[in-house]
Each structure stands twice: as C-alpha cells, then as structure tokens.
A protein has these predicted regions:
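A nucleotide- and high-energy phosphate-metabolite-utilizing enzyme signature
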Residues: 1-322
Length: 322
C-alpha cells in the first residue's frame, strides 16, 4: 500500500532507503538483566518518498515521506514487542534517548541525527552514545552510524569541565531518581550504586578513548579491564569496582526475580530482606541473613563511592554533602 521508501545517493541514483535499530544503555552494552527494558533508537538512511512496488495496484498506493513510512514501521515494531499476551509481553520499550527525547520524532534520518549531535545535543547525550550499538537492520547503515558515533564520542574536543559535567549529572540522578533515605536504598542510582561504576568507566573512556581505541568498549566490565590493561586504573581500584559491580548486578537479578518486576529499590522490611538474602546465599546458620547482606551492601557501596569521589570529585566538593 505504501510502497518502498527511497532516497538518492551522491550520484543522484535512487535506491531503497536503509533502516536500523540502535540499542542504547544495557542493550547496547550487552548487559541486559531480568526485566530490563530496551532502550532503542530508530534511524533511516535519508529523506525521500515511497514509490510503488512492481505489480502494485495504483489505486491503493499511498505515497508517504520516508519519515512517515519509518514512523509507521517503528510503531509496528514497538507494538509487537510490547503486545500483552496470556504469557506476558516480550519487552518494555524506551525510546526517550532519541534526539530531543519525547519531544522529538520517533525516527531520525542519519543526517538529521548527525546534525543534532553536532549542534544541539547535551553533554550527557554524548556520554550515552558510548553504549550505542546497531542491533538490527542494514549492515551498511550500521557501519555509517558507528563510524559517526565514534567520531562524536571520541574525536571531538572535550569540555574543560568534563569531570564536573559528569559529576553534576550524577548528583541530579541520585537526588531525583535515587531518592534514598533511612528506609530506602537504590542499588542502581543511589549512593555507591551501579551508576557510580558506570560513570567512572565512561569518564575515563571519554578522557582517554581518542588515543587508546582499545577503550572504546560498550560493556562496563570490559571497559574496566581495558582501563587496567592501559594502566589508567589502579589494580586495587579495578578489582573493587569489578567485584562491586558484579555484586550489585547479581543483587539486581535476584531482586527482580523475587518481585517479578523491574525494581532497583531495597525494602526496609526485615522479612523481605531476609528472603532476598537467602536467595543470594546468605545462610541462617551464620546469623541473621538480612544483617549479613546489608553489611556487605554497605561496605560495597561505600567502597565504590570512595573511588568515584576520588576519580571524579571536583576540588572542595563532595557528592555526599547534604
């Protein structure tokens, strides 16, 4: 009915426009966990219009712009992935990492995507591109996209206040999303949580990735290993960040299995904590399992936060100050 989306190459020759799906976040880093949603972006090769396919009924053909066509396609993909069935649904989908977030179009042409990142993107969007990976679609478009993102992330000059930018972003996340208090702990965005480890890794990638291509990893643990190999992260820090990150990731898995939903908050209820601790392997014979677990959690997050503060902290400032 809508035909094929077409665009022109540099010589003016018309051809079918390519399409791809970009995985961001945990999907891009191949770090999906139980109940992880999919952070995705839809891109297409370039602007143009659809043309009828061979043997198409001209009475039924409805020409569309490429953007209109690919918006329909993206909506169809989201609908299939999120369709609720008696067995549940496949994934929750999050497309807010696209240019301009929810205010922007659902799909972007590669030239428009590039222009956005060259002129309008916020510093955190450059950081988010570290994990961008084409997960489906045209191989040729994937090469173009990943070449461009490597240039944006690693080849462009860095702001003089890079550490402060990342540090302030972390502050906002902890305050607005973590929202910790005496009764609530957030293992992802809270103090010493997984985001602390990820931001340390990403800060050092941005700082050194231009001259050291081996650091251009999407996976956090691979990045930590690469930083160690390049002599940019002390062995003791690397071991503590790696073991701490694995502990928190395993905790996230168990927490989501116990609750059968996407959660990152620890309850203050002793019975629920004891149940979670037993799932993690803390034995009753060694004492109260919830206390043993909370002691290790406190020690792990404190260690992670100390390393984060040392590497990223602005002079005379502290993320832990009220």
């Amino acid at each position: 009915r809508y035909g094929l989306p077409c665009c022109e190459d540099a010589s003016g020759t018309s051809h079918e426009a390519a399409f791809a799906i970009v995985g961001m976040g945990k999907l891009g880093g191949m770090e999906l966990n139980y109940h992880s949603d999919l952070d995705i972006i839809f891109i297409y090769e370039g602007e143009g219009k659809t043309r009828p396919v061979a043997a198409a009924d001209p009475e039924r053909f409805r020409q569309q712009t490429n953007q209109q066509y690919f918006v329909r396609l993206a909506q169809r993909i989201i609908s299939i992935l999120t369709l609720m069935t008696p067995e549940g649904h496949v994934y929750d989908i999050d497309t807010r990492l696209r240019p301009s977030g929810n205010q922007g179009p659902l799909v972007s042409s590669l030239p428009a995507y590039r222009q956005y990142h060259e002129s309008s993107a916020a510093p955190w969007e450059r950081q988010a591109l570290i994990k961008a990976r084409v997960v489906a679609g045209s191989t040729e478009l994937a090469v173009c996209f990943e070449t461009f993102t490597a240039e944006i992330v690693y080849e462009r000059p860095l702001p003089d206040n890079l550490a402060e930018e990342i540090y302030r972003l972390r502050q906002r996340m902890e305050k607005e999303i973590g929202k910790e208090d005496a009764r609530h702990r957030n293992i992802k965005t809270g103090r010493g949580g997984m985001v602390d480890v990820e931001f340390v890794a990403q800060y050092l990638q941005l700082l050194h990735g231009r001259d050291r291509p081996s650091l251009r990893c999407r996976n956090t643990l691979d990045t930590l290993a690469g930083l160690l190999g390049e002599g940019l992260l002390a062995a003791d820090d690397c071991e503590k960040l790696t073991s701490g990150y694995k502990f928190l990731r395993r905790l996230e898995n168990k927490l989501r299995l116990v609750h059968d939903q996407s959660v990152n908050e620890l309850t203050s209820d002793p019975a629920s904590l004891a149940k979670l601790a037993r799932h993690l392997g803390y034995e009753d014979s060694l004492g109260q399992p919830e206390k043993l677990f909370l002691d290790q959690y406190a020690e792990t997050t404190q260690t992670i936060r100390e390393i984060f503060n040392r590497i990223l902290q602005c002079p005379g400032d502290s993320l832990d100050e009220p």
